[in-house]
A protein has these predicted regions:
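Helix-start (N-cap) detector for alpha-helical repeat units in TPR-like alpha-solenoids
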Residues: 43, 77-78, 125-126, 159, ...
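TPR-adjacent "capping" and linker segments in tetratricopeptide-repeat scaffold/adaptor proteins
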Residues: 2-5, 29-47, 173-196
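Short coil turns that delineate tetratricopeptide repeat
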Residues: 40, 74, 121-122, 156, ...
Length: 232
């Protein structure tokens, strides 16, 4: 081993590894100053690399890059949101492969970052829009409705020109989901309790809850699906 054989790229890679995994290192600020001085566009480069790796389903490397980004600039809310979205997507990948325990662990990590970005000041509308879909996936319809309503409240004063085509689509999609939740009454406590009980193996209690819900909500297909799931 010859120290003079170490390249700048290897040193920077080592620093990024520290930033990703050693959050309590006393020298983090020093390491950040080094890497941003040598590579002023490092955040942009890493973001592009992480997104590309995610698209190619190279999840291990993508996760390492996202964690390094978060370590490089812990106060950047956009980075935290991207990390939440990545963890959310990786949880889906694990669940689709039948690895439910791994999926649950990644969902828990994703929720932690979603919660963090939803508490950011000034508020970031996209944090609530994306968190809404995360809650929908978990059948937490009341939380989803709250998130989408907050997104609409944060964007209500923006014109269509300011929002752009994608922003207008998001507003319309958020309103559509809110209406569906309200019309089907699936943010009702009985529906949520039934889902939680059945998914935790307490089918008898869950079936009682969903039958009570169906008395006044007989046209809600989600409820009939939940009933069938409990009877399986």
């Amino acid at each position: 081993f010859e120290p003079n054989e170490i390249t700048t790229e290897q040193i920077l890679a080592g620093i990024l590894t520290v930033l990703a995994y050693d959050k309590k290192n006393d020298n983090l600020d020093y390491y950040r100053s080094i890497i941003t001085k040598v590579k002023p566009d490092i955040k942009k480069e890493l973001c592009e690399a992480a997104i590309l790796k995610t698209k190619n389903e190279d999840f291990d490397l993508a996760e390492e890059i996202f964690l390094a980004l978060n370590g490089l600039d812990p106060e950047d809310v956009a980075i935290k949101l991207n990390l939440a979205l990545f963890l959310d997507q990786r949880a889906d990948s694990y669940r689709n492969s039948g690895l439910n325990e791994d999926a649950d662990a990644y969902d828990a990590d994703a929720f932690s970052y979603y919660e963090d970005v939803m508490n950011a000041e000034p508020p970031l509308p996209d944090a609530f829009f994306n968190a809404g879909f995360f809650f929908m996936k978990q059948h937490k319809y009341r939380e989803a409705k709250d998130a989408f309503e907050t997104f609409l409240a944060l964007t209500c004063d923006a014109s269509d020109d300011e929002l752009g085509e994608n922003g207008v689509y998001k507003k319309e999609r958020a309103q559509e989901i809110i209406s569906n939740i309200s019309n089907q009454n699936i943010d009702d406590e009985s529906f949520k309790a039934a889902y939680d009980l059945i998914s935790s193996g307490q089918e008898e209690k869950g079936l009682e809850e969903i039958k009570n819900f169906l008395v006044n909500n007989s046209k809600v297909w989600n409820a009939w699906f939940l009933l069938g799931w409990g009877l399986r």
